[in-house]
A protein has these predicted regions:
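Conserved alpha/beta-hydrolase
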Residues: 46-65
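Catalytic histidine-centered segment of alpha/beta-hydrolase-like enzymes
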Residues: 228-241
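Alpha/beta-hydrolase active-site loop
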Residues: 68-98
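Conserved alpha/beta-hydrolase "acid-adjacent" motif
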Residues: 204-210
Length: 250
């Protein structure tokens, strides 16, 4: 995979489509959190399906500059989208790539599912797929207790992931407000035709009822699985690709 940097801050891996198409179709991948970046196999899978694939790191996470959650992570994804019509220069040898996005799709899982859903509000985004997404941060305190006994989740992240996330207590607390980076706060603005979600009833971290409730309020499509736990986005994309491809092509 190639590497580039957007807005002088956001590092992204990317792949051009394995086979050229008449129109450039772009997929932006939104990572979960916390976790090590590992969507390279998914990027390769999607590239072979004919898409440009961009896999950015949020500001303040991993290779990117900045402070994590200083801004809503979905804005980082949209900042990447802003830059694409200008072309992309890979960092190792300076090779330049030109593209003119005809259709843009956003895929995210868990924490990144919220980013994907919020990106659907941008008119440039054609469709989004959100896998086991966090749709309402009211679940946060209960979810934290399942991951750590540390009373400060941000402190746990700093200790466990080092500089992988430059996360302050103050920025993490913004999620508790219900207004910051929260799809539920903007559900009335959603276009249900642009959103497809996947979730398992036995997900231990994101309660399925919260996602089902969001789907009912927004009208978004939800494929609810009986089992699967906290579903891996790569698995979902490969297992349900024919269905997802039809959704993209509507």
């Amino acid at each position: 995979m190639f590497r580039t940097r957007f807005k002088n801050e956001i590092v992204a891996e990317f792949l051009p489509p394995a086979r050229p198409r008449k129109q450039d179709r772009v997929i932006l991948l939104c990572d979960g959190m916390p976790g090590i970046p590992r969507k390279q196999p998914l990027s390769d899978f999607l590239s072979k399906k004919g898409y440009w694939v961009f896999y950015p790191r949020y500001r303040g996470a991993w290779e990117s500059s900045g402070k994590f959650l200083e801004r809503s992570p979905h804005e980082d994804i949209l900042d990447v989208l802003d830059e694409l019509p200008k072309g992309v220069k890979e960092l190792a040898f300076g090779r330049k790539f030109s593209l003119s996005p005809a259709e843009v799709f956003v895929i995210g899982g868990s924490f990144g599912g919220a980013a994907a859903i919020l990106c659907s509000l941008d008119p440039r985004v054609h469709r989004v797929v959100a896998n086991c997404p966090v749709v309402d941060w009211s679940i946060l305190r209960a979810s934290e207790k399942k991951e750590t006994s540390n009373k400060s989740y941000a402190a746990y992240i700093r200790e466990a992931f080092g500089n992988g996330y430059r996360l302050s207590d103050a920025n993490w607390r913004k999620l508790y407000t219900g207004k910051f980076y929260n799809p539920a706060a903007r559900v009335a603005e959603m276009d249900p035709a642009k959103i497809m979600m996947f979730h398992a009833k036995d997900d231990p971290f994101v309660p399925w009822r919260s996602v089902d409730r969001f789907a009912r309020k927004s009208g978004a499509r939800l494929k609810l699985l009986k089992t699967g736990g906290h579903l891996r986005t790569e698995y979902i994309m490969q297992r349900y690709w024919p269905e997802i491809r039809q959704f993209f092509e509507r």
